[in-house]
Amino acid sequence: DGAAMSFGRNSAFFDCYFERDLQSGKITETDAQEIIDNIVMKLRIVRFLRTKDYDAIFSGDPYWATWSDAGFGDDGRTMVTKTSFRLLNTLTLEHLGPGPEPNITIFWDPKLPEAYKRFCARISIDTSAIQYESDKEIRSHWGDDAAIACCVSPMRVGKQMQFFAARVNSAKALLYAINGGRDEMTGMQVIDKGVIDPIKPEADGTLDYE
């Protein structure tokens, strides 16, 4: 149902073109900021066609387009750009209001530029619209070309896929494991026999639910 999706790491990508056009005089800083403002507003008006069951879970039809930003490259250079500031600055627009899109995720490190850290703190206090993850932890597992794939889960951009299972029915899964893949209510064998061996009280003992 498209519960959440990655918007990738776009600040540095946009920044290359902004800098080129600023230097050539094609755009002004106001134009660059307006482009980012418009992107954020467009991300907020996207709506997915979803099942009624999904709509019953969440109000407001969020889709959590996660925009990853900041952090460091493996070569030690910060990945904070002018557009990183522009993105946060968009959140100061009075008419924008709170919203889950874009789901801005800052790859945090104490060594990030001081001005950027202070700006993040100010915007966080004013809007509660930013989440933070450890840049060090992400780079140690997925490298510096990583982004949040879902709401909070990192992956290598363009190289990995993530299957979203945050709403798995744990109680049902446990019953399947106990019953060898047979549905308790319908009697249907939903998992091929032999894939999961059912629990046998005489051999495995009684399940202690405590």
What do these predicted regions represent?
Residues 1-210:
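Conserved catalytic cores of very large enzyme subunits
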